[in-house]
C-alpha cells in the first residue's frame, strides 16, 4: 500500500512498527513536542514526522524525501537546546526507537544504534569493565551527541566521544547505507 500526501510518497518499506505522520494526522503534535527534551518547543512544523524502527526505515525515508525534493532533519534523543532538528517543512526522521546495542568485552568494543541513551550504554559497558565518554545529562542519546563532537565531562581524561569511535554506519543524503 502506498500513501501519498503533499508530494512525498511513503510506501510499504516503512513497517507497521514504524510510524509516519503528516501535520493533520492524529499524534503529529504530540510527536513534534516529544521531539525535544524541554517544554519550550519552537514554533516550527515539519511537513512529516517519520518515527523509524529500523535502518531500512531510515533508508526509505531519506530516499522518499530526496525524490520529493524535501529537506531532512534527524532526531535521536532531542536533547538540543535550540531544537534545530525541528524545522519548518521537510521531513523529521526520529531515530529514537533505534536503541539496539551489543558489547564484545574481549575486543573492548560496542556497537550501538543512535537512539540509545548514553547513560544506558555506559551502564551496560561498566558491567563488563568497559567505559565510553558519554554525555553528562541523562537522556542524551549517542546519535546527536556524536554528531556534535561528543564533548562531555570526561573529555580531558578520555578524549571526545568521537575520538573513541572506530567506525560508523550511516545513511547518506542519497539514502544509501555506508560504512
Predicted features along the sequence, with ranges:
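N-terminal accessory segments
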Residues: 1-158, 178
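Active-site and channel-lining beta-strand-loop segments
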Residues: 101-102, 160-179
Amino acid at each position: 500500500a502506498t500513501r501519498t500526501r503533499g508530494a512525498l510518497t511513503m510506501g510499504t518499506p516503512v513497517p507497521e512498527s514504524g510510524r509516519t505522520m503528516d501535520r493533520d494526522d492524529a499524534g503529529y503534535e504530540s510527536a513534534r513536542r516529544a521531539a525535544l527534551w524541554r517544554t519550550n518547543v519552537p514554533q516550527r512544523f515539519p511537513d512529516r514526522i517519520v518515527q523509524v524502527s529500523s535502518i531500512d526505515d531510515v533508508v526509505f525515508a531519506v530516499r522518499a524525501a530526496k525524490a520529493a525534493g524535501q529537506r531532512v532533519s534527524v532526531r535521536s534523543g532531542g536533547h538540543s537546546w535550540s531544537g534545530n532538528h525541528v524545522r519548518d517543512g521537510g521531513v523529521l526522521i526520529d531515530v529514537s526507537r533505534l536503541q539496539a546495542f551489543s558489547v564484545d568485552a574481549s575486543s573492548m568494543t560496542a556497537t550501538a544504534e543512535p537512539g540509545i541513551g548514553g547513560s544506558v550504554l555506559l551502564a551496560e559497558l561498566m558491567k563488563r569493565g568497559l567505559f565510553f565518554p558519554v554525555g553528562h545529562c541523562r537522556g542524551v542519546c549517542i546519535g546527536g551527541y556524536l554528531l556534535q563532537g561528543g564533548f562531555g565531562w570526561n573529555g580531558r581524561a578520555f578524549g571526545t566521544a568521537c575520538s573513541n569511535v572506530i567506525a560508523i554506519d550511516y545513511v547518506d543524503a542519497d539514502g544509501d547505507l555506508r560504512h
